[in-house]
Amino acid sequence: MLSPKRTRFRKQHRGRLKGISTRGNRICFGRFGLQALEPSWITSRQIEAGRRAITRYARRGGKLWIRIFPDKPITMRPAETRMGSGKGSPEYWVAVVKPGRILYEMSGVSETIARAAMRIAAFKMPIKTQFIKTPVLATIQ
């Protein structure tokens, strides 16, 4: 699963999910993509589950790019612990995703295979997503 090798600080504030994604909202590497339509935290486990679903369906055909990285630590307190005595220890990592963000990109496969693979990965995500593709430029005659 994805997580940073090292961070400057162990713990972070929760923050807010305001607005739409201004970066990472266009297809850069592949021909097909899965785009987020809602704001959410996506855990490293969910990212990995989506990656496995896509690669399993495509049978190692084509290439896959993961466009999000979980760089935010989420802390948790032990069960049945009294209030106070500081913030809990980091338990897992999440990627902060705003609407419009590209989650996965794919190329080297047909559109039907890419659409089906992305649909399976979309079921693993906690948010609504949409399948997008880059417009193919007409050949110059």
UniProtKB/Swiss-Prot annotation:
GO molecular function: rRNA binding; structural constituent of ribosome
Family according to the record: Belongs to the universal ribosomal protein uL16 family.
The organism of origin for this protein: Zygnema circumcarinatum (Green alga)
Main location (coarse class): plastid
Protein keywords: Chloroplast, Plastid, Ribonucleoprotein, Ribosomal protein
Gene Ontology cellular-component terms listed: chloroplast; mitochondrial large ribosomal subunit
Subunit annotation: Part of the 50S ribosomal subunit.
Protein name listed in UniProt: Large ribosomal subunit protein uL16c
Subcellular location: Plastid, Chloroplast
Any single biological process term in GO: mitochondrial translation
HAMAP family: Ribosomal_uL16
Keyword Ribosomal protein: yes
Gene coding for it: rpl16
